[in-house]
């Protein structure tokens, strides 16, 4: 660039250039971002930017100074040196990345403007979009170049801020700021980019105050009137059409030399404006941090409320769960207690029942022991006191005559003694009787035989059954009489067993039955009688099942003192035997089962007959 030049020219380029013309007052931030209007088109030659015109004129001055340096005055030299210094700084900063294609100020401002309008969501897409926007306004740059240039301007901006903070009260601040005065417009654009969200009116008011201060300082000098007129002219030119923009820019170029004479005053105004901007930035940062803290506090309170509500719900659910568990456990315990009580009651009942059974068993055992002891004593008496056959025959004849008298006297009293009772018919198939042929009465009975095989399988006719009942009753009455009169027949009655005497009585009447058969028949009769007597039901007189029921009832219900009822029953039975058919006769069957013990009460003063396992127990 300086090939063929003089060393003095290099010295002049190194010298500090005058500051650029100040920004017009009350200029909005959106209008300060670019030196051309929004409707700018890079292909329209009639709308040439103001800054480009001034830059071209400066280049022309610089070119003229390059060839005719001996004809230029101090003001022109100063202007040429400022232009040269601007190009020199740009060439130093952009030498590495933009050696062949340097960035002009308009291009940098357009880059900052487009970059400030794009959100930094996707970096690569952002720089591609910025590159396309630059291409639309006539600047062809790649996304990588745009990114590198923006980062470079960003570093310069931060370096400028650091220098201003460190040298606020130092006189060197004016010189440092003058060295960066050529990039003032770019500095303001970068600052606008980093503080894009702030209020534009507040910034414009601060800038207006700074311009007022600067105007007051300029009025203290010699050329204050001219400067104010130029500033007012610039304000008017900004509102005019695009055709008048070129004339205003030329006037600014002519007046820039006069403005340079008051450079020191302008530097003071710029330093004060920059310090005020820094204070505004700090205040806005503080407010921003305060707002962020408030938002964070609101978010924190909201999250804490959610957590508290969730914890309260969890505690309530846990409490309900515990209550349900306690309730279930109490119900379970109550059920177990009720079950235990029921089991205890059941066990107690079983114990009571067992105690009763044991008492009954003990009573039964006691009765059996008494019977066995009495029976053994009875057998011993029979063995020790045998009687002669003559005595037996005489006693039997006497008793036979007494029985006949009783039978004759009681025949007239039979209708009065028989009364209806509550009876229940029993199936004859439950305990069938063994069949036997009916034998006529033997007027001349033969002596009984000792073997029992002769009467096996023979039926018991009804008259024979009635005879057995009457004989059993008569022997019981005779035993009572023997107890009253011990001197009469007590010795003979005790000498022979009960069923042996009954068998002999049956043989005298004409029925040949052994003592064992008589005993078995008597047990069967009592068994059927007990079954029918336990049921409280009326029983007809002509019932086929257990036809001797009424006789047994009358037998057990009559008083023991008299014998008229027995004879009457015998006479009635004899008459019934002649009138009833043959099929009504009841037989007997040998029972092989064990019959439980039963005590037959014949009335007050009568002996009890105990039947147990085929034995006739009397006590």
Curated annotation (Swiss-Prot):
Region ranges (Disordered): 11-41, 62-100, 382-414, 434-458, 557-619
GO molecular function, a single term: cis-regulatory region sequence-specific DNA binding
Motif residue range(s): Nuclear localization signal: 503-510
Ranges annotated as biased composition (Low complexity): 435-444, 561-574
Compositional bias of kind Polar residues: 384-396
UniProt biased composition (Basic and acidic residues): 448-458, 575-585
InterPro entries tied to this protein: Myb_DNA-bind_4, SANT/Myb
Domain Myb-like stretches: 102-154, 459-526
Pfam families membership: Myb_DNA-bind_4
Intracellular or extracellular location(s): Nucleus
Principal location listed in the UniProt entry: nucleus
Entry keywords, A to Z: Coiled coil, DNA-binding, Nucleus, Repeat, Transcription, Transcription regulation
Gene Ontology biological-process entries: positive regulation of DNA-templated transcription; regulation of DNA-templated transcription
A GO cellular-component term linked to this record: nucleus
Coiled-coil annotated spans: 307-361
Compositionally skewed regions (Pro residues) per UniProt: 16-27
Role according to the record: Probable transcription factor that binds specific DNA sequence.
Name of the protein in its database record: Trihelix transcription factor GTL2
Organism: Arabidopsis thaliana
């Amino acid at each position: 660039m300086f090939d063929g030049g003089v060393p003095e020219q290099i010295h002049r380029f190194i010298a500090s250039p005058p500051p650029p013309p100040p920004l017009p007052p009350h200029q909005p931030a959106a209008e300060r971002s670019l030196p051309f209007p929004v409707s700018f088109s890079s292909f329209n030659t009639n709308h040439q930017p103001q800054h480009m015109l001034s830059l071209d004129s400066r280049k022309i001055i610089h070119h003229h100074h390059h060839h005719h340096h001996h004809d230029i005055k101090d003001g022109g030299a100063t202007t040429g040196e400022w232009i040269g210094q601007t190009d020199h700084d740009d060439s130093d900063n952009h030498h590495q990345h933009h050696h062949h294609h340097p960035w002009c100020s308009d291009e940098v401002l357009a880059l900052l403007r487009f970059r400030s309008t794009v959100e930094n969501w996707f970096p690569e897409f952002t720089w591609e979009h910025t590159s396309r926007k630059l291409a639309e306004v006539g600047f062809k740059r790649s996304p990588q170049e745009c990114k590198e240039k923006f980062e470079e301007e960003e570093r310069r901006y931060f370096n400028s801020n650091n220098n201003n903070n460190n040298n606020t009260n130092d006189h060197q601040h004016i010189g440092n700021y003058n060295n960066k005065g050529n990039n003032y417009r770019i500095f303001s654009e970068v600052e606008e980019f980093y503080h894009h969200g702030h209020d534009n009116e507040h910034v414009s008011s601060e800038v207006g105050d700074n311009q007022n201060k600067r105007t007051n300082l300029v009025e203290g000098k010699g050329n204050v009137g001219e400067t104010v007129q130029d500033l007012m002219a610039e304000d008017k030119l900004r509102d005019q059409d695009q055709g008048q923009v070129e004339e205003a820019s030329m006037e600014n170029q002519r007046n820039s030399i006069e403005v340079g004479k008051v450079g020191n005053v302008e530097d003071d105004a710029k330093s004060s404006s920059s310090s005020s901007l820094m204070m505004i930035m700090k205040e806005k940062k503080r407010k921003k941090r305060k707002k962020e803290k408030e938002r964070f506090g609101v978010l924190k309170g909201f999250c804490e409320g959610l957590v508290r509500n969730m914890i309260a719900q969890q505690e309530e659910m846990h409490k309900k769960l515990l209550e349900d568990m306690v309730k279930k456990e109490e119900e379970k315990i109550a059920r177990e207690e009720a079950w235990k009580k029921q089991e205890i009651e059941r066990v107690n009942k079983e114990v009571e029942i067992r105690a009763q059974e044991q008492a009954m068993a003990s009573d039964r055992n006691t009765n059996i022991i008494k019977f066995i002891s009495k029976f053994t004593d009875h057998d011993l008496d029979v063995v020790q006191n045998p009687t002669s056959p003559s005595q037996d025959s005489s006693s039997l004849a006497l008793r036979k005559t007494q029985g006949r008298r009783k039978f004759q006297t009681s025949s007239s009293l039979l209708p009065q003694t028989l009364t209806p009772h509550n009876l229940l018919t029993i199936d004859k198939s439950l305990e069938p009787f063994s069949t036997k042929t009916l034998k006529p009465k033997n007027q001349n009975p033969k002596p009984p035989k000792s073997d029992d095989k002769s009467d096996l399988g023979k039926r018991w006719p009804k008259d024979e059954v009635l005879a057995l009942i009457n004989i059993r009753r008569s022997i019981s009455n005779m035993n009572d009489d023997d107890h009253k009169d011990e001197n009469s027949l007590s010795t003979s009655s005790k000498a022979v067993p009960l069923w042996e005497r009954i068998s002999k009585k049956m043989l005298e009447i004409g029925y040949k039955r052994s003592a064992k058969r008589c005993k078995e028949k008597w047990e069967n009769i009592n068994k059927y009688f007990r079954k029918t007597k336990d049921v409280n039901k009326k029983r007809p007189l002509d019932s086929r099942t257990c036809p001797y029921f009424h006789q047994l009832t009358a037998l057990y219900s009559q008083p023991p003192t008299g014998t008229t009822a027995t004879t009457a029953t015998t006479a009635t039975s004899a008459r019934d035997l002649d009138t009833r058919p043959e099929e009504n006769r009841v037989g007997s069957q040998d029972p092989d089962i064990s019959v439980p013990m039963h005590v037959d009460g014949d009335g007050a003063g009568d002996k009890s007959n105990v039947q147990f396992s085929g034995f006739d127990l009397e006590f």
